[in-house]
Regions:
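Active-site lumenal/periplasmic loops and adjacent helix-entry segments of GT-C-fold
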Residues: 116-189
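Membrane-embedded helix bundles of polyisoprenyl
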Residues: 45-53, 110-115, 182-189
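Transmembrane signal-anchor helices characteristic of membrane glycosylation enzymes that use polyprenol
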Residues: 80-84, 106-129
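Interfacial transmembrane-helix boundary/kink motif in multi-pass membrane proteins
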Residues: 94-109
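Short hydrophobic/aromatic-rich motifs at helix boundaries and adjacent loops
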Residues: 26-30, 107-112, 136-141, 165-166
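Generic alpha-helical structural element
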Residues: 10-14, 43, 47, 108, ...
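Membrane-embedded, hydrophobic transmembrane alpha-helices
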Residues: 1-97
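A generic short alpha-helical patch detector that favors 3-5-residue windows
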Residues: 17, 46, 50, 107, ...
Length: 189
């Protein structure tokens, strides 16, 4: 139970960070029109996820890919994003957008069902050779070494994929299932 709970909390933290920083970046650039459309929320998540990858890459380059620096950097960016949204929106109620006039339970149930199906697959053992033989070991090496690792016997010795950085962050704060769940949630996009 704690295995899946830690993975779910890790993914929830990544999603919350991504959405919040994406909202702040869109507000700063003037790209929000004040409506809480699903497309705008999705765009906020993707922009914030890109910022998460940038933060992790800078920390990995500086050999600071450890729980304390990663947590401090992401916490600082989250506080700055919240403060900017508070200032620009004028309160908590306006940060999260206007309340919808009528709830959409069917859409929410479909998204929840898709998430549950993907998370069941994410908690199963990894079956793809590529994932087991290459991607997860590289992410584990990044998490263990605290930064980018040079692999001398590869064609490109310094090969840092964005996904490897996110998976190494998920491995630091979650269980072995956290990278799979992050991958499954990205498949929803």
């Amino acid at each position: 139970m704690t295995y899946s709970l830690s993975a779910a909390l890790c993914v929830l933290a990544i999603a919350g960070f991504s959405w919040l920083t994406g909202q702040a970046a869109q507000a700063k650039l003037g790209l929000q029109d004040g409506e809480s459309e699903p497309d705008a929320c999705l765009l906020s998540f993707m922009v914030g996820f890109g910022l998460l990858i940038c933060v992790l890459f800078v920390l990995a380059t500086a050999q600071l890919l450890r729980p304390l620096p990663v947590g401090a950097a992401l916490g600082l960016v989250t506080v700055i994003s919240l403060a900017y949204l508070w200032k620009s929106a004028g309160g908590w109620r306006n940060i999260f957008g206007p309340t919808p006039s009528r709830p959409r339970p069917v859409g929410m149930l479909l998204v929840l069902a898709l998430f549950l199906l993907l998370s069941l697959r994410a908690f199963a053992p990894a079956l793809e050779w590529d994932e087991l033989a290459y991607h997860l070991p590289v992410a584990r090496d990044f998490a263990r070494s605290g930064g980018l690792t040079v692999f001398e016997n590869l064609r490109y010795p310094l090969n840092a994929w964005n996904l490897h950085l996110v998976w190494s962050g998920a491995l630091m704060f979650g269980s072995e299932a956290a990278p799979h769940l992050v991958n499954a949630c990205l498949a929803v996009l």
